[in-house]
Every structure is written in C-alpha cells, then in structure tokens.
A protein has these predicted regions:
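Membrane-interface extramembranous regions
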Residues: 2-140
C-alpha cells in the first residue's frame, strides 16, 4: 500500500474531501441557525421586542429577516464565487452588528452569545469554502 505522502494527488483528494465535509457540516449548521433566527424575527413577539430594546425600527427587523432568507438561499445554491463572497460579507456584517448592538445596550452573554456562536459557524463555513476554492483553482 502506497503512502499518501508519496502521492500528492492522494493528499489533495483527502484534503479536498475533508474540506468538503467540513464545509457542508458548518454551512448546514450556520444556515439552520440563520434560518431559525430569520423565522423567529418575523413571527415571535419576544424577538420583535428585543429589536425594539436594541433601538431598531420594526421595519428593519422584517427587512433583515428577508435578507437572511435570501442569503441562506444564495449560500446553498451553486452561484458564482464572487456572489458567494458577498453573501459571506453580508452575514459577517449582520453578525458583527448584532454583537455590537447587544454589547452597546449592556446585554449579557445570554443575548450576545447567539451572534458570537453563529459567527464561529460562519467562520468555519467560510474557511472551508475558501479551502475548496483554492483546491479547485489549483486543479485547473
């Protein structure tokens, strides 16, 4: 049996497979979390109250929810890499802004922990997606 160290193609294949598995796990969890929060923002009165507590107008909550739904759809769809970059950038801005908003009004970890944890899922998804992009460009 040949060592994968002697065959760079085997290392690349294993790395790509691992990155693909990591990407889909992180992206699925991230997408579920974002979809859940978007749905909650549209339907749960306590979430609407939280937006008011943060100082945001009600229409912003609705716009943000629909933007999240669209972002998740684009994240999971086979779209051009540049568009997916913009989706990741948009989610980074949303999560960073949520974290800052909660900290600015003095909320505790029970409030700002959700955007922080979702940010970790975002970072993992983006990291693995970039690894797959690099592997794809090297194979061309």
């Amino acid at each position: 049996m040949e060592s994968s160290f002697g065959n760079p193609a085997l290392v690349t294949t294993r790395t790509t497979r691992g990155a693909a598995i990591g990407y889909w796990i992180a992206t699925a969890l991230f997408s579920l979390q974002i979809t859940f929060t978007a749905y909650a923002q549209l339907t749960l009165p306590q979430v609407a109250e939280a937006f008011t507590h943060l100082g945001f107008p009600d229409y912003f909550r609705v716009e943000l929810s629909w933007a999240k739904f669209i972002g998740v759809a684009l994240l999971l769809a086979p779209v051009p890499a540049r568009l997916k970059e913009w989706v990741y950038a948009g989610f980074a801005i949303v999560l960073g802004s949520a974290l800052i908003a909660h900290l600015a009004v003095g909320d505790g970890p029970d409030a700002w922990g959700w955007p922080a944890a979702t940010g970790v899922l975002w970072a993992l998804s983006y990291y693995f997606w970039r690894r797959l992009q690099v592997a794809q460009s090297e194979s061309e």
